[in-house]
């Protein structure tokens, strides 16, 4: 292993310290609070609700484009980059009741309409054909062109306002949590006195907002949902449960699980999910301050299928079949679905306990990254590794280096190789931890613990200049030009925090690894 470049480590650490000091210096004033922040449908703008009004910002380049002092605002949603806004107040003024929705034209400075509902509004979603309003137990669907009420849906209690609407008018789907249902428990050994059923809270209803008909129920997780997101084209659904260790991606049309990723080894709160506009990546932010980027490639899809098949075989071989001794007892246990097998991941998520959060970065496995391969997938090292292969290794942010991360990287690389050889001999409880699909890239947000975050992804690849020394790792690579800037083609990963900051990171779409902080801005300017 090459020794760390001290110049690179010093420069990267200094950059990280500058970011942290910027956050400290731009903390909000006593009476300034952010009640709401979100991206618009194509991640080109940010809308923010404050205790004294609301503002709209452009993302590329970042800058304020509209502001209004209008009392305490709890929801501000945009219709792409148009002048149409949906506003809901916090209730501190009579005209800004949390039960009242205002549709505003910012260009004309007029209120198009106001709608009052029987309860507090928890979420508002828009696309070019529909406006959806979510209360705790009711969904209202409107024609956005004339604000005519088209349909209402009674739902189970949804206090967290969990709902997703596709930006696409062609695949105009709505996703929301399904009511609880009883499901078979594949880990319960059936006896005459046992109850082989458990309550399932993690299903998602897919509703066609154009035909106003439900289309399917996707069995996403066994435990309650924490986050859901639909892709820009409405073809993919991403989900995370309240345990927060497994991220899944489904086909909206068929309900088939296409991808499964392991975010980490112990539970955490997932705050947001987002697809890249080209469906190449899905991004997850959590309470660990780390944002994980997962690649939706061919190998990741194959690994998901392979993992499901392996767990199905293991479960079938190790779980006693009660039909052999009691043919009249619970015949459903004769076959365990692959989805139930994969729930072993969630049932055994907290085996490692409260380990250090730095380990959750999972230090990317340094394997060759040809197009279509994942840095987190199992690979083999060749003694004749070429310079081209080295250039394909994941980028490393030297400021995030630690002994824990290096040990983690080595142990995961060895562990996954061992899993390939020994996986068939391990019980599901332990083989589930060796999930082949891990994150392709990650970034660390310079924020306090438990700071809520929302993520977005840029729609194009940018040519960005970054310090060459920032990513150098080879001690022999120090030259007189180490401080020069180098041009990198990067996808922009954007993060908004509840502390009031906007961050822009650069993701190398081919190499993955650690994302580079490119820009940060206070939302209290």
From Swiss-Prot:
Oligomer status and interactors: Component of the PI(3,5)P2 regulatory complex.
Q: What's the domain remark here?
A: The N-terminus might form a beta-propeller domain involved in specific binding to phosphatidylinositol 3,5-bisphosphate (PIP2), leading to the association of the protein to the membrane. The L/FRRG motif is essential for the cytoplasm to vacuole transport (Cvt) pathway, for the recruitment of ATG8 and ATG16 to the PAS in nutrient-rich medium, and for its recruitment to and dissociation from the PAS under starvation conditions.
Keywords, A to Z?
Answer: Autophagy, Endosome, Membrane, Protein transport, Repeat, Transport, Vacuole, WD repeat
Transmembrane region positions? none
One term under GO cellular component: phagophore assembly site membrane
Name the membrane topology term. Peripheral membrane protein
List every stretch annotated Disordered.
307-402
Which Gene3D superfamilies does the record associate with it?
Answer: YVTN repeat-like/Quinoprotein amine dehydrogenase
Question: Which PANTHER family does the UniProt entry name for this protein?
Answer: WD-REPEAT PROTEIN INTERACTING WITH PHOSPHOINOSIDES WIPI -RELATED
Q: Which InterPro entries match?
A: PROPPIN (IPR048720), WD40/YVTN_repeat-like_dom_sf (IPR015943), WD40_repeat_dom_sf (IPR036322), WD40_rpt (IPR001680)
The name this protein goes by in its record: Autophagy-related protein 18
Question: Which residues lie in Low complexity bias regions?
Answer: 374-386
Spans of repeat WD: 220-260, 265-304
Q: Which family does it belong to?
A: Belongs to the WD repeat PROPPIN family.
Q: What are the leading ranks of the lineage?
A: Eukaryota, Fungi, Dikarya, Ascomycota, Saccharomycotina
Q: Where is this motif: L/FRRG motif?
A: 261-265
Protein function: The PI(3,5)P2 regulatory complex regulates both the synthesis and turnover of phosphatidylinositol 3,5-bisphosphate (PtdIns(3,5)P2). Necessary for proper vacuole morphology. Plays an important role in osmotically-induced vacuole fragmentation. Required for cytoplasm to vacuole transport (Cvt) vesicle formation, pexophagy and starvation-induced autophagy. Involved in correct ATG9 trafficking to the pre-autophagosomal structure. Might also be involved in premeiotic DNA replication.
Q: Where is the composition biased (Basic and acidic residues)?
A: 387-400
Query: Where does this polypeptide localize?
Result: Preautophagosomal structure membrane; Vacuole membrane; Endosome membrane
Name of the coding gene: ATG18
Query: Which residue windows does the record flag with biased composition (Acidic residues)?
Result: 339-361
One GO BP annotation is: protein transport
